[in-house]
């Protein structure tokens, strides 16, 4: 009888072993479809009432109110505080590349274009007071934390027939990115791209930006957030400088550039790739990580207490197109995405960050879920990829540009704001909303307030 029980036990153990060792799910070739991803045993994040709630304040969009009025700044920060936000991110370097803080590195912003009741309007800044300092002063009185946001690898835009340092200064114009187009490699200055990106691999660009960050870190800030700390897209950068740096990285010459890497003008990967394609993606990710390390050191050299961080889009599966690996170096990217080399994970930069703002920019009809292109899913996936390397990961929606097809009713959009707070806060370390202007224009403060109140109620249960 003992032998019979032993035999049965052995059979059961064998069956359980076989069931537990089912075949792996196939990996989507470029990882751009709805792939099953590692959840990394996402431990339930402890809910706390002190989870931060960030609201972004875009410079251009809010310029009609804030460019020349401290009273308007105080008024709207009071509304943010009343709604339950704990942190503000003040954009002080819009895409023109000029700034709204004190520095000798570049000129002050003189004007911005914004949508007003009379259309797309030029708003001049005539005030002489310090824009960033005005936000800091108002925020401190309200017990709000203040973070300065900058557009990083940009130097101008096409507004007003060209605005920014790359239009004023020929030496800076040489810093702009060289794009691969169907017609060949051309400067972004000769293309219709509205934002003029700089080449992240250019040492002069990196030095300039680090010096700019040192000046910014002199302010009484809680944090600094880098936006657009990336390449334009897959078409950039194909300058001679980038080619030489890539060849040095490879340890060999490329005879047919850029075709040996990507077809001319390619904006996405095709089913076939050359031996150099994935190595090029790795090189770009390394370039961005190396810069982020320099930028962090620049900030910390002035004030070690400032939280250094980034804004990134939550769509990690395609974020390689802009040269960024925002995951943890411990997240083995190539286990899930065929576009990644075995070494791609080494250039994840989450471990360099004190805080990360994740754009969970899904439709108002897609608040809940586990995958990308749902708000909750963006946050869950981000936590899975960051793997604790960054201590503060906050995510949330763009509440003004989330329904371009106009599929949601106004009430559905209102309720999506309410629902988004708890959905995102439960999935990560806090909440992030873009942008203040949208809440103001649609008079939606009350929905943000309701959502924050419900999320905090959950934490008190």
PLM regions: where:
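Short, acidic/polar
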Residues: 65-81, 205-215, 332-349, 409-423
């Amino acid at each position: 009888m003992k032998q019979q029980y032993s035999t049965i036990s052995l059979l059961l153990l064998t069956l359980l072993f076989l069931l537990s060792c089912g075949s792996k799910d196939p990996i989507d070739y470029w990882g751009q479809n709805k792939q099953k991803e590692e959840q990394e045993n996402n431990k339930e994040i402890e809910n706390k009432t002190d989870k931060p709630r960030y609201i972004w304040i875009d410079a251009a969009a809010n310029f009609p109110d804030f460019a020349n009025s401290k009273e308007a700044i105080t008024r709207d920060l009071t509304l943010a505080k009343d709604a339950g936000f704990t942190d503000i991110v003040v954009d002080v370097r819009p895409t023109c590349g000029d700034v709204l803080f004190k520095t000798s590195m570049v000129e002050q912003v003189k004007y911005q274009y914004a949508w007003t009741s009379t259309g797309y309007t030029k708003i001049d800044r005539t005030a002489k007071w310090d824009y960033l300092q005005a936000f800091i002063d108002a925020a401190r009185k309200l017990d709000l934390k203040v973070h300065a946001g900058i557009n990083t690898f940009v130097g101008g835009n096409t507004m007003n027939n060209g605005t920014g340092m790359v239009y004023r200064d020929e030496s800076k114009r040489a810093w702009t990115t060289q794009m691969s187009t169907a017609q060949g490699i051309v400067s972004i200055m000769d293309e219709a791209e509205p934002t003029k990106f700089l080449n992240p691999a250019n040492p002069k660009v990196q030095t300039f930006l680090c010096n700019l960050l040192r000046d910014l870190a002199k302010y009484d800030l809680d944090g600094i957030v880098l936006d657009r700390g990336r390449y334009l897209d897959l078409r950039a950068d194909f300058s001679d400088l980038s080619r030489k740096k890539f060849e040095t990285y490879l340890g060999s010459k490329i005879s047919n550039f850029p075709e040996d890497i990507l077809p001319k003008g390619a904006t996405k990967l095709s089913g076939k790739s050359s031996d150099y394609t994935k190595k090029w993606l790795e090189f770009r990710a390394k370039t961005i990580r190396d810069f982020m390390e320099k930028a962090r050191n620049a900030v910390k050299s002035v004030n070690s207490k400032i939280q250094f961080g980034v804004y990134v889009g939550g769509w990690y599966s395609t974020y390689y197109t802009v040269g960024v690996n925002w995951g943890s170096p411990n997240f083995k990217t190539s286990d899930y995405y065929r576009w990644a080399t075995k070494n791609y994970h080494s250039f994840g930069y989450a471990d360099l960050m004190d805080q990360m703002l994740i754009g969970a920019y899904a439709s108002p009809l897609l608040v809940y879920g586990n995958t990308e292109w749902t708000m909750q899913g963006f946050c869950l996936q981000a936590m899975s990829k960051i793997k604790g390397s960054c201590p503060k990961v906050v995510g949330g929606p763009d509440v003004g540009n989330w329904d371009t097809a106009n599929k949601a009713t106004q009430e559905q959009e209102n309720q999506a704001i309410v629902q988004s707070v708890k959905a995102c806060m439960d999935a990560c370390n806090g909440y992030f909303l873009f942008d203040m202007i949208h809440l103001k224009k649609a008079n939606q403060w009350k929905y943000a307030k309701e959502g924050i109140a419900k999320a905090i109620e959950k934490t008190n249960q």
